[in-house]
Regions:
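N-terminal leader/targeting and assembly helices and adjacent pre-domain segments
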Residues: 1-171, 224, 239-241
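Acidic, glycine-rich two-metal-ion catalytic cores of nucleic acid-processing enzymes
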Residues: 138-241
Length: 241
């Protein structure tokens, strides 16, 4: 490796460690909210008759989704601010504040992501609570990791897209850059995606287990197959166009 390549790699690794803070905070808040609500549901199940039990089980997914939404919403501004600060040096002056613009639309973005995920998670929650009436911590951790990846990457993409719209100098547009965690746990298809750079409104290409190609906006994109989406640890970084 050349000295320049080593410097760039070190810079990228330091950045990765820093941006992981946004993911970790969101993941912890989502997991904590899920554990608390599921524990409350389990406690209720122990004190009711069969009719009430069924009603509680049927509403479990909606209740957990509401708590996830609430937990994620408290972290929105810090995620958007981090995305803005990372891209700021690569952009130019703006016609208005991009952060406020994204934050104003963030609630509907989170609602969309949570609703999509809970379509699949609700059935699993129902089955697990019906069978065991216990909080499955491994399942909670998996949902929290997947959702945090999706939400952070989506808000990053929205932030950079808004920055591009508000740029005074359109020659300095921001692109997005896919980075895997680059360890022995990274999936082969995600390792192949590592280093891809596309326009903010462009699509990344990932191979899937069937040998086909999947297009996505970011890590954790709902368009991806479960094998490419669940428990993904990849991140995005802005690049100057």
């Amino acid at each position: 490796e050349t000295t320049q390549q080593m410097v760039e790699q070190e810079s990228e690794e330091l950045w990765y460690q820093r941006v992981q803070g946004s993911y970790s905070l969101l993941e912890q808040r989502i997991a904590s909210a899920m554990r608390a609500e599921l524990s409350a549901i389990v406690s209720e199940l122990e004190t009711v008759d069969s009719v009430q039990r069924e009603l509680i089980l049927r509403s479990a997914g909606r209740r957990v989704a509401a708590k996830i939404h609430q937990a994620a919403s408290t972290t929105v501004r810090s995620i958007v601010r981090d995305a803005y600060q990372e891209a700021r040096s690569k952009a130019d002056k703006f016609l208005e504040d991009p952060v406020a613009k994204v934050v104003n639309s963030a609630d509907s973005i989170i609602a969309e992501i949570v609703e999509h995920d809970m379509q699949y998670t609700s059935a699993t929650l129902y089955d697990k609570l019906s069978a065991d009436a216990v909080v499955d911590l491994a399942h909670v951790a998996l949902v929290a990791r997947t959702l945090s990846t999706t939400i952070v990457a989506r808000l990053q993409t929205e932030t950079w897209a808004t920055m591009n719209q508000l740029l005074k100098d359109k020659r300095r547009t921001i692109k997005k850059y896919w980075i895997s965690q680059r360890d022995d746990k990274v999936r082969d298809h995600h390792q192949e995606a590592d280093g891809q750079v596309v326009p903010v409104d462009g699509k990344f290409k990932l191979r899937n287990n069937a040998g086909g190609i999947e297009l996505c906006d970011h890590p954790g994109d709902a368009r991806l197959s479960p094998a490419n989406r669940i428990n993904c640890r990849c991140v995005l970084r802005p690049r100057r166009g």
